[in-house]
Curated annotation (Swiss-Prot):
This is Argininosuccinate lyase. It comes from Ruthia magnifica subsp. Calyptogena magnifica. It catalyses: 2-(N(omega)-L-arginino)succinate = fumarate + L-arginine. Pathway: Amino-acid biosynthesis; L-arginine biosynthesis; L-arginine from L-ornithine and carbamoyl phosphate: step 3/3. Belongs to the lyase 1 family. Argininosuccinate lyase subfamily.
Length: 480
């Protein structure tokens, strides 16, 4: 939503709020003599999008209040009143009863104002020893920690779907490609497990990213810490943080943990985009390897015959959106002096959008993949084209004592002969093959078969059905 659209949408609400609230923000307006410009209120407000952080803001405030009581800055009664008030506010947020105010700018002041209205002046004590600067970055870390866990689970669900499909299609032969040209026969199950492995590394990156997310900045206050005798380790314990940020300037000013997540998300989307591209190609009439289900496709308003692969196309397109969010935040951060600057308000929308986009793409892929129809015969027949067993013939000659470079040359000539006579290598007679090298014997035809080519690659990580089955077995253990 543009700021101009926001202004038009909320102008009436803002005027109504202005009639029943003072014109200068009470949370910071002590040194101001003029009210904030009407448009600037909307231009500078973040409540349009940061209200998603409400549960985390309240979670952080409850932990902060508990710590304040334990160090003697709140009484037991004050702490209890604050926590009960915050719990009521959380309930209002969840049920939709909470009334968000643009004049209160952001999530923090909206919740604090409601708390003060509920419990009186005791609510004003909650902000002791903290700033919105360390409060917001704590909220983001709590939010992102949960989202990383959710995304990890979505990836593992997709991995399970891929492993199941790979197991069904272990013996399904398809052409493996380089430069989008048929190269060698592979198992379709092996191809699916390639994406399983990519996603496995994505999970590792998320796990590693989570370590740096899980560091608590609360207690950094505005930038220099606080004069109160707070116990940051206690607050970290209450919030489940593994460590605390050891430099208050760094704690409030950097967003590298968000950038790291966006980078990881971009890599995940890149993997999904590559997969999408292949599904789009395979479902085309030119390849005809798979049939996408009607429920994941749409048609054309003018061409009755069309069945468009919208879901993989959208995932491919949304990859650019996530890349853009990463670039956006890198650009926002690149020239900021320490510590906090208002620029950092722009960190949230790229983050929230990336989280929502990534989760949606993972979910739709996990739902779609099991419903795809595999056209095994078409895959097999396509593999028979393009001389995909040429390397096998070269390896055969090497095993007969010919140096590989010489074998490569011999097979190249035999392929040229096959092209001229419109025959695959497996369709050449023994006499025709022996014309290129006398060491070729009748056993070559097993080597030149697609099944023979597949079975010959029987080592760890290769495409033989036996190795694919072992890979799936190992992969399933990582999902437990």
């Amino acid at each position: 939503m543009t700021n101009d659209t926001q202004y038009k949408r909320h102008k009436t609400v803002l005027k109504e709020e202005s009639r029943r609230t003072i014109q200068i923000n009470k949370s910071w307006g002590g040194r101001f003599n003029e009210p904030t410009d009407e448009f600037v209120k909307i231009f500078g407000a973040s409540i349009f999008f940061d209200k998603i952080l409400a549960p985390y803001d309240i979670q952080g405030s409850i932990a902060h209040a508990t710590m304040l009581q334990e160090v003697g800055l709140l009484t037991e009664n004050e702490k209890n009143k604050i926590i009960k008030g915050l719990e009521r506010i959380l309930s209002e947020v969840k049920t939709g009863e909470f009334k968000w105010s643009i004049t209160l700018e952001d999530i923090h002041m909206n919740i604090e104002a409601r708390l003060v209205k509920m419990i009186g002046d005791t609510g004003k004590k909650l902000h002791t020893g903290r700033s919105r600067n360390d409060q917001i970055v704590t909220d983001i870390r709590l939010y992102l920690r949960d989202q990383v866990d959710d995304i990890t689970n979505e990836i593992k669900r997709l991995q399970l779907v891929l492993a199941d499909l790979a197991e069904k299609e272990t013996n399904t032969i398809m052409p493996g490609f380089t430069h989008l040209q048929a190269a060698q026969p592979i198992s379709f199950g092996h191809h699916m497990m390639a994406y399983f492995e990519m996603l496995a590394r994505d999970v590792e990156r998320l796990f590693d990213c989570r370590k740096r997310i899980n560091s608590m900045p609360l207690g950094s206050a505005a930038l220099a810490g606080t004069t109160y005798s707070i116990k940051r380790t206690r607050t970290a314990e209450l919030l489940g943080f593994e460590r605390i940020c050891l430099n208050s300037l760094d704690g409030v000013s950097d967003r590298d943990f968000v950038i790291e997540f966006l980078s990881t998300a971009s890599i995940i989307m890149m993997h999904l985009s590559r997969f999408s591209e292949e599904l789009i190609l395979w479902s085309s009439a030119q390849f005809n390897f798979i049939e996408l289900p009607d429920s994941f496709c749409t048609g054309s308003s003018i061409m009755p015959q069309k069945k468009n692969p919208d879901v993989p196309e959208l995932v491919r397109g949304k990859t650019g959106r996530v890349y853009g969010n990463l670039t956006s935040l890198l650009t926002i951060m690149k020239s900021q002096p320490l510590a906090y600057n208002k620029d950092n308000q722009e960190d949230k929308e790229p983050l929230f959008d990336t989280v929502d986009t990534l989760k949606a793409c993972l979910r739709v892929f996990a739902d779609m993949i099991p419903t795809i129809q595999i056209k095994r015969d078409n895959m097999y027949n396509s593999t028979k084209q393009g001389y995909t067993t040429a390397t096998d013939l070269a390896d055969y000659l090497v095993n007969k004592g010919l140096p590989f470079r010489d074998a490569h040359k011999v097979v190249g000539k035999s392929v040229a002969y096959g092209i001229e006579h419109q025959k695959d290598l497996s369709e050449l007679s023994l006499e025709e093959l022996q014309a290129f090298d006398s060491r070729i014997e009748n056993d070559v035809f097993e080597i030149l078969s697609l099944e023979g080519s597949l079975n010959a690659r029987n080592h760890l990580g290769a495409t033989s059905p036996n190795q694919v089955k072992q890979a799936i077995k190992i992969a399933r253990k990582t999902l437990k």
